[in-house]
Amino acid sequence: MKSLKSFLIWGIVVLVGLASFTTLALSRGEQVSAIWMVTAAISVYCIAYRFYSLYIANRVMQLDPNRLTPAERHNDGLDYVPTHKGVLFGHHFAAIAGAGPLVGPVLAAQMGYLPGTLWIIFGVVFAGAVQDMMVLFVSMRRDGKSLGDIVKQELGTVPGVIASIGILMIMVIIMAVLALIVVKALVHSPWGTFTIAATMPIALFMGIYTRYIRPGKIGEISIVGFILLMLAVIYGEDVAHSSFGHWFDLDGIQLTWAIMIYGFVASVLPVWLLLTPRDYLSTFLKIGTIAALALGIVIVNPTLQMPAVTHFIDGSGPVFSGALFPFLFITIACGAVSGFHALISSGTTPKMVENETHVRMIGYGGMIMESFVAIMALAAAASLDPGVYFAMNSPAALIGTDANTAAEVITTKLNFSVDAATLLHTAKEVGENTILSRAGGAPTLAVGMAHIMSRLIPGEAMMAFWYHFALLFEALFILTAVDAGTRVARFMIQDLGSIFYKPFGNTDSIPANLVATFFAVALWGYFLYTGVTDPLGGINSLWPLFGIANQMLAGVALIMCTVVLVKMKRDRYVWVTLVPAFGVLFVTCYAGLQKLFHSDPRISFLAHAGKYRDALASGEVLAPAKDIGEMSQIIFNDQINAGLTALFLAVVVIVAVYGFRTAMKARKVGWPTAKEIPAVYRDGKQPEAQHEA
C-alpha cells in the first residue's frame, strides 16, 4: 500500500513536470504564465533529490553515519566545529549563492526564457549539484583539505601545484566580481549599506549567544536574529534620511576599502563568532525573499513577456556578445554549475559537517536551492516588458541617454516595441531618475521582483520600496559569498605556501593566518579596484572572465572527483562525474578560445585590445573612454583578461592530462589507492552496511 501511494505521488510529480515543460517549449505566440517555470523546476528538483542524489549517496559514495567527520575528530573551536545540519545548510547556501544565480540568468534572458530554463534545471541535476556533493564528500574523507591540495594528493605534485595556482587565480577573479556586484548595488545607497552593516553586530550577538549564553538553542536565537534583521531593513530608510545617514553614503572606492576590511576580519575570526551566524542570518532573508517571490509568481500569475527564443541566439544581442553556444552557459554560470562551490565544499563546509550522511542535504540540496534562485531570477526578468529589459541592459553607446532615443533604437534596431512614456513611467515607479543602461543584471532583477511583489502587496509607493528592498537583498545575498570565499582563499594560500615553508600551512598559527588573509584580500581587492575604476564599467570586462573561470574550475573539480572514484575502485559509477566533466570542459574551453582568438572585438579580449590600440595609435579616443589614459587602461585590462584566460585554459588541459594518466594507472592496480584519512568510527561501531538507492 505504501509503495503504491509513493508510486502515485511521484507519478503525479512526473506528469506535472512534463505538462510544464510541454507548455514552455511548445507555446508560440500565446501568453505563457511564469508558473510553468516554477512547476517545471520544482518537479525536476524533487525527482532528482529523491532518487538521483540518493543513488549517489548510497551507491557511489556509500556514506557511513558511524564514521567520524573531520569536525568531530579535530573540533578546535576555530575552523573545525561540528554544526547542526540546518545551520550548516544555511551557512553553505549563503556561501555558495552569490552573484551568479541572480545576475547570470537575467543577462541570459536576452536569448529568451527557454534556453536558460532548460540549462538551469538539467545542468544543476546532472552537473552542478553532483559536483558540490562529490567535492564535499571527497574533502571530508581527507580532513577537509582544499581542492588544490586534493589534486596534489591524488594526481601528483606537479599538477597539484599548477592547479593550486590556477585555482587561486580563478578564486581571485570570482571574489572580485562578487564584491563588484555588491559595490555597484550599494554605491550612494545609505539604506542598503546600513542594513548590511547591521548584520555584523547581529551575527556577533547570535554567535556569542549560541556558544556561551544558550548553547544549542538554535530556534530561539533564529527568531531573535530574524526580528533584528527585519528591524534593520525597515528602519534602514529612516537611518538613510537621518542626520548621520551620510556615514553610510559611500562611493565605489570607499565601499571597495570597506569590503576589503570586512573580508580580512571575517576570515581570521573563529567561524562560530561571525561567519556562520551571519551567513545563517542572511539565509533567512535570502530564502524568505525567494519564497515570497515564488509565492508572488503563483498568486499574481505574471505572464512571460520575453519570447521563448529570441533572434539574439545568433550572437547579435546588445546585453552580451556571442552565440547561444557556448556563451549562454558561461553567462548563466552559478545557476546550473559553479566551480566556486567546489572551493566552499572543500573549504569551510567540510570542516563543519556533523555527520557524513548530511552531505546529501547540504551538497546536493544546497545547489538545488541555488538553482531555484536562478529560475526565480529568470522568471522575474522574462516577465518584464522586453522593451524595458533591453533599455536597462543595453549600453548607452547603442541606445543613447534619453528615453526618446532609447525607445526609437530598441523599436527599430532591436525589434522590440517600447515607447518613451513606458521607460519614464517605470523609472518614476521605482524612484529612480532613469532606468537606461543599468547594466549588470541586478537592477533588472530588482525591477522584475518589484513588479511582482507590488502586485502581491499593493499600496502607494510599494513599487519603489520593493525595488530598493530587492537591491538590498541582492547585495546581502552576494556579500555572504565574499566572506566565506576569503576564508577559503586563505586556506588555499596557506596550502601553497606550505610547499616552500611547511609551518605556513598550519591553520592554528595566528601569524600564518594573518599573512595568508592579507595576501588573499590584496589579490581580489586589486581586481575589485580595477573593476570599480574601469571605463567599461567593470561588469562588462570581468563578467565573461568570471563565467569562463567559474566553469573551468568546475571542470577541474569534476576531473578530480572522477579520478578519486577510479582510485576507490568504483569504476562502474565513474560516469556520474565523467559525463558532466566532459560537457562542462568542452563548452568552457570553446568559449575561452573564442575570447582569445575570435575576430569580433565584441567577443575577443585580444581583438578588442587591438581595436583600441589602433585607435590610440591614430590619436582617436573611442567611447566609452574619455581620454588617452582611459584608452590605455582599457587595453591593459583586455591584455590582463586575455592572459588570465590563457592561464585558465592551460591549467585545465594540464589537470585533464594528468587526471587521465592517473586514472589509467589506478585501473591497473588491484586494490583501492585513494588517499583517504583512516576511518574512525563513532562509539566503536563498525561501518554501516550500504543500501541500494
Question: Which positions does each model-derived feature cover?
Answer:
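Extracellular/periplasmic helix-exit of transmembrane alpha-helices
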Residues: 297-313, 368-448, 484, 529-534
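Flexible loop linkers connecting adjacent transmembrane helices
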Residues: 53-81, 107, 117, 121, ...
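Transmembrane helix-loop junctions in multi-pass membrane proteins
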Residues: 18-31, 100-102, 114, 172-188, ...
